[in-house]
């Protein structure tokens, strides 16, 4: 972490601490071990509650460092780079699901926003239960972000009714198909 990155990381963590808000920290692309160690040190120097921090873009080398903290453990699943579904499953098998969060992206590089459900499928194929998959892919991130007070866990856990008979401005996307109503 450069001195500038260090200063601005501390400033952003301080804002989160002052307002008691959760914060997501992206580990550096280079020197991931050193950067993760320094990130943890800055978190402690600022004094933000570790349970309000998720450290993201973890891998096999950096996850053990974060396990010694109360921070949440974020993993970005990408095609060809960073973390794959299979590597994520191996980490879950080794370290368990507590505070583990899986995400994906649709960003500037090669990415696949469907990597989260694909990771869920890989977890099921590896013998994880549906409840364990739901814990990692849904409940853990909801529990983390609900700490903000801006996310109602009950509301997001209640399935929305589906009625494809409803239209928007007299228009339907069904194109002649039978509507689903649940």
Located regions from the model:
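Divalent metal-binding pocket/active-site signature
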Residues: 1-61
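Short acidic/histidine-rich active-site segments
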Residues: 30, 97-113, 133
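Short acidic active-site motifs
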Residues: 61-62, 87
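A short, acidic, amphipathic alpha-helical segment used as a generic capping/interface helix at domain edges
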Residues: 84-93
